[in-house]
A protein has these predicted regions:
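Cleft-lining beta-strand/loop regions that shape enzyme active-site pockets
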Residues: 2-7, 11, 83, 91-101, ...
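Metal-dependent DNA phosphodiester-chemistry modules and their immediately adjacent helices/loops
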Residues: 179-180, 274-276, 312-343
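C-terminal or mid-to-C-terminal helical accessory/interaction module adjacent to the motor/catalytic core
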Residues: 343-350
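A residue-level signal for conserved active-site and pocket-lining positions in enzyme catalytic cores
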Residues: 43, 193, 330, 362
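PDZ/PDZ-like peptide-tail recognition elements
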Residues: 50-96
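Structural motif
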Residues: 109-113
Length: 387
């Protein structure tokens, strides 16, 4: 498959037949599909293409002992029970995406203490997570008492979520904290949006957050940890739109034509986990000189793949097929990543404690830009009287 579909017909200078001969003897020692995946993966790694991945087909799977679930909150064990330290927040416009403990029918506040789950004392268990095993999407009865000590303990019905949703809730809470930091530091002059990936959900996320910030004087687009997809051109097209005129109905703030154009200053955040289409987006921003990039060099996965290379057992040996080069003919991204204009590291200890040096630098850059080049206001000349 790699011989026939890899973006470089010369196999990056690798003798592919010799690579096959090198790993073929290991096939006789393979006992299951997982071991075959290892052999295939080692052989594919010889060509050093990041978008070449092995996906298993049919595997023997052990029966799961228990699927963990969460309440969408940070809990701390105390001598009374589990105190609700923080409930993960979500977009106000997406009520269905709320954390279990933040839903309107659930009367639990930060500081409250959970004392029992389905009638079992939480302090009698190794951890509250043991009592939530296999409870995702099922109604669970909590015994909760107020953190201020007032009132009798009460029963609360809540529906936990699986770990994928728990992780997404935590991620969303982090996104909101970044947006709040930007709004507070800039007195509302600068907006913020984060793109987790470049897929269908991220189209909705971008549309919701970008147009809400369309009239800000500055904007930070954060693609750190972005794991790719295929919407970079769609986003860049929105950023390329320019206002050339303004509609001015009586008593209403003028609006631009082209419609929904962002007229402010822009900064894009990247890091070493910005991957695939997140990198293509960053490369496009840099090539078109739309904004400075701040952060760390990206992962270097610049050759895209397809899912057309399925195997007999429905597994897949994904091949990096679609290389990309710039208008100067130079190959882009693969193996080298996208280098930021301003390199900034996030120190681990400070980051663990809530710091975000990369975001702070982006804010400082925009504040300086707004001072040096303030965005011109909509200002029409007086309408001439009829002669």
């Amino acid at each position: 498959l790699h011989r026939d579909f890899l973006y470089d017909a010369k196999m990056r200078g690798v003798d592919w037949k010799a690579a096959r001969d090198k790993y073929a003897p290991l096939v006789e020692r393979v006992t299951d599909r997982a071991e075959l995946n290892d052999v295939l993966g080692m052989m594919v790694a010889e060509v050093g293409a990041l978008h070449s991945q092995i996906r298993p087909g049919e595997l023997r799977r052990t029966e799961q002992e228990g699927a963990p679930a969460g309440l969408g909150a940070v809990l701390a064990r105390t001598n009374e029970g589990y105190r609700v330290e923080h409930v993960y927040r979500s977009e106000a416009e997406l009520p269905s995406a709320r954390a279990p403990l933040s839903r309107p029918e659930v009367d639990v506040k930060e500081g409250d203490v959970i004392t029992a789950v389905n009638g079992k004392d939480v302090l009698g268990a190794r951890d509250i997570s043991d009592l939530l095993l296999n409870q995702a999407d099922k109604q669970v009865l909590l015994q909760v008492k107020r953190g201020n000590g007032k009132g009798a303990p009460r029963a609360v019905i809540v529906t936990p979520v699986n770990m994928a949703k728990q992780t997404a809730l935590r991620y969303g809470d982090w996104e909101l904290s970044r947006a709040e930091q930007v709004a507070a530091a800039s007195q509302g002059r600068i907006g913020y949006l984060h793109l987790r990936a470049m897929g269908a959900n991220d189209i909705a996320s971008f549309a919701r957050d970008f147009y809400a910030n369309i009239n800000r004087e500055g904007l930070i687009i954060d693609v750190r940890r972005n794991n790719g997809g295929n919407i970079d051109s769609w986003i860049i097209e929105k950023l390329l739109r320019k206002a050339w005129a303004y509609w001015a109905p009586p008593g209403v703030q003028p609006s631009s034509n082209m419609q929904n154009t962002f007229r402010g200053h822009l900064v894009v955040l990247v890091d070493e986990l910005t991957y695939s289409d997140g990198e293509t987006f960053a490369a496009g921003i840099k090539a078109l000189k739309l904004a400075p990039l701040v952060g760390k060099r990206t992962a270097g996965a610049g050759v895209w793949l397809s899912d057309n290379t399925r195997l007999a057992d429905n597994g897949m040996a994904r091949v990096a097929e679609n290389g990309q080069f710039g208008i100067d003919g130079q190959w882009l991204i693969e193996g080298v990543g996208v280098v930021p204009d301003v390199e900034v590291d996030n120190p681990p200890h400070a980051t663990f404690n809530g710091g975000d040096r990369q975001l702070e630098v982006a804010l400082d850059m925009l504040a300086k830009k707004l001072k040096e080049q303030p965005r011109p206001a909509f200002q029409a000349q007086p309408i001439p009287a009829l002669k």
